[in-house]
Structure formats: C-alpha cells, structure tokens
C-alpha cells in the first residue's frame, strides 16, 4: 500500500501527500514527504463528505461518482472512491496540474483496489 501511495506522490509535481482512508473517514495509511504539513488532520471530514456524495447515486440519476475535487487558495485535494469502503486522497499545490494528478490517481487507484 505504501509503495502505491509513494508512487503517486513521486510521479506528481507539486504533490504534498497521499492517503488511503476508509468510508468513515479514518486514515488507514498516509504518505507525507513534507511531514510538517500535517495534511491528514481534517481529512476525516473530507472522507465523510465524500461518503455522503457517493450516496447521491442512490437518490438521483447522476450516476456513480468517479472522483471529487476540493480547491483552496494554496492546495487541491483529490478524492477517488475505491469501491464502497475506501477512498484514496491526493493533495497537490494549487499551482500545479490537477488534470495530470487526476490521471495518475486513476492509475494508482486500480492497483490499490486490488489490495483493499
């Protein structure tokens, strides 16, 4: 698991960290190269929001969500469901390419799904 999260962070310019969390928002494993950022704090709240958003599929005709993007002035958080019980999260600096990060997140998500 750590290998896949490290690969994700290593392949993205401006990556600040990556994490695997369960559907209740609990961080199962995190990789933060700049450990002083403490990115995992508050991540549980994003996990709970993502869980609620994935339930929209049951209430509407939107279809199953594939990913979520939360932007702030200094960073972007990307979340991608790994089935009904897990999410993978990736933080990048706001000034970097979120589309490339989403692409890499999709690739690594396939590998992580085999582990969870």
Model features per residue range: what roles?
Residues 1-17, 21-23, 27-116:
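Non-catalytic interaction/Regulatory regions outside core domains
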């Amino acid at each position: 698991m750590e290998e896949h999260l490290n690969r994700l962070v290593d392949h993205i310019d401006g990556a600040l960290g990556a994490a695997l969390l369960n559907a209740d928002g609990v961080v199962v494993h995190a990789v933060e190269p700049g450990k002083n950022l403490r990115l995992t704090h508050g991540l549980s709240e994003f996990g709970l929001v993502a869980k609620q958003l994935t339930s929209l599929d049951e209430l509407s005709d939107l279809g199953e969500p594939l990913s979520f993007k939360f932007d702030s002035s200094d960073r972007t958080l990307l979340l991608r469901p790994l089935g009904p019980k897990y999410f993978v999260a990736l933080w990048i600096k706001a000034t970097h390419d979120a589309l490339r990060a989403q692409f890499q997140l999709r690739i690594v998500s396939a590998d992580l799904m085999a582990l969870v």
